Amino acid sequence: MKYLQSTFALLTILAVSIAQGNTEKKLNVLWLIIDDQSPWHSIYGNDLVKTPHIDKLASRGVLFTRAYSESPVCSPSRSALITGSHAIRLGTHDHRSSRTKENQIFLPENFKTAPEVFRENGYETYNSGKDDYNFFYKKSDLYSIMDSKVENKLAKYGKSGQGSGDWSDIKSQKPFFGQVRVSGGKDVGDQLPDLLAKSGYPVVKASQVTVPPQYPDIYEMRYNIAMHMNSVMQTDIEIGKILSRLERDGLTDKTIIFVFADHGSDLPRSKEFCYIEGLHVPLIISAPESLEGVESGTVRDDLVSLIDVTGTALALTNQDIPESMDTRNVFDKNYKREYVFSASDRSANVIDRVRSVVGKRYHYIKNYKLDRPLFNYGHREMMAIDYPDSKYGYFAKLRSMYEDGLLNEIQATPFGDRTAEELYDLQNDPNETVNLASDKNHIAELIEMRGALAGWIEETGDKGAFKRSSKSLVEVVQRIPPHWLKSPEFRDFFDEIQSAP
């Protein structure tokens, strides 16, 4: 009997040791998610900024030059990332949706998000950044490390807010999957130049920048472009502090680091719009030397969809990518995307429907709502009208210039009538100012890109094609000032309410 007990005890100790050994061999995964930032870092060729920490990280990993977001606004993009799936497939395409009990959006039965897959494979998970997903979920299902107060306050209907948790909170020997928000282009204030100067960084001035042709060369545009460049250096400071903490805690050689933005900058034609400037994002993946496949100092120019961050994180930690996900592993030997797709639907107070496909050279955009202009008094312009001294004040200046006839044809286009199709040659026209959709010399390219987009829409069962329910409109009306709601759908909704008995 004593022999059996001793044998059992020995086997138990051995099993625990093996389990701990396997756990220790697993690498941590850290997502550093930048808000609203285009790839204007020095590693991407911008000579006006210095980003030494990001540059060093890229030198230890892989830099992707053609990564594009699923959506040009945060919550659909983040919903696609956390699910590894196209937002229009799951119905998570409208910005800040599923925030009321009456308008809950549920993922398919038995669908697992990325944090849930990590947890099932022995990881601790946390999200200290944005909790901004357009579907119903319980935070404690996704994240094992969190503040119970945050769970009670934010999880019930998947509302937007800041998460909680840190790798220092982990008491077990398990590896971690962590999400950390980096302020990027969103938290930009007048104090930023002083911060940069005190930190030994240059300060980009309005007089130094070049204004792209889609915008008028006015001080307000120069200032905002300069401040976005300064935000890039603020990002470098924040990431540098995180990397220093990893080094201090002995985690640098145990952690795969992903650095990327949810979408591009917040310039007028960037955020919320499916132009390249709103979709193109930085992407760096850095891993310990012991991990095969991630070769230090590599630069890749192939097309990458940002949702592939999810599949890559799973694959690099030897986890299977669920068949329910659209994401892929960018380091798979057979990885290749002929096209990258994106969508823009309701962004805050404005309803639209735009679909986009980026190919090796051309970018095709399909506009469905031709009864409204591109710049349709979105929330940034309404902020400028209601609060002229806000950082979005230059939106009001642009509209004033349009009304006074001071914008050229290219600059005035977003205020005028929409065209159903747009086609741009990214090689010769990176700022997308010449629409080739009606150019007979580009019929073949138009047909190719049109067909690719149609195939994606059909394959995903695009939920953005369906009419919005009254409940989804009520959800918006309850939190946004009525005078901001200028889309025809809201006008019709208000008319129905007034005419109801």
Where do the PLM segments sit?
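Catalytic-site neighborhoods of secreted/periplasmic enzymes
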Residues: 80-189, 328, 334, 343-344
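Histidine-centered active-site microenvironments of extracellular/periplasmic hydrolases
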Residues: 247-305, 318, 322-326, 342-343, ...
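Long, internal low-complexity/basic segments
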Residues: 22-27, 34, 39, 63, ...
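Polar, surface-exposed loop/tail segments
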Residues: 52, 81, 130, 136-139, ...
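C-terminal cap/loop subdomain of S1 sulfatases and analogous C-terminal strand-loop tails that border
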Residues: 310, 317-422
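A short beta-strand-to-alpha-helix junction
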Residues: 47-51, 69-73, 103-111, 222-237, ...
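A long, amphipathic alpha-helix that forms part
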Residues: 205-255, 287-291, 315-316
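Active-site segment of extracytoplasmic enzymes that catalyze sulfate/phosphate-ester chemistry
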Residues: 31, 38-113, 117-123, 464
